[in-house]
Amino acid sequence: MFIGLRLRIQVDEDNLQSITQQLLSHLAGPDSVAAVPTAVHSLSQHAQSPHGVQTSSGLAGIRAYRLTLAQRILSICSRDTYTNVTDFEWYLSVLVDLAYVASVNVGLQIRDQLVDIVGRVKAARRYAVKLMVKLLNDDTFLLNASDEGSCAEVLWAAAWICGEYCGWDPSSL
């Protein structure tokens, strides 16, 4: 079972990435569905620092590390057709947040999961449309869409979801 454990270890920069990779391997599969949000939150926190900003972990600016974090979040939650996800509105929010903070090329995976979830989970469609409308109306996201690692591919998913399910929330379109 995943147990939230905070350790403070003093290490040099050479060992930090190795230790972090070992910790990530333990998060590969939380033992209970209830532990998934905690694990995803923990991974998301590490991915949230902006490009080039040194963080307490020292690794958020390393592209390979950020890619590993993003892929781990996507893998944990999508495993066995989303059996680890009990709240799809929460996971849709996680996917959109990840599109904003990843700064690595995971846009295709996020796009595919957004479309897949909305197609499978009728109860999440209204929320998805609202979320996608916000994304499409975000000028900053749109202006940065040409940047490497911008996850601009999610804009396709947002447009498709809004078009396909526009009747779910016509007031926001």
Identify the meaning behind each predicted range.
Residues 1-173:
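Extended alpha-solenoid helical-repeat scaffolds
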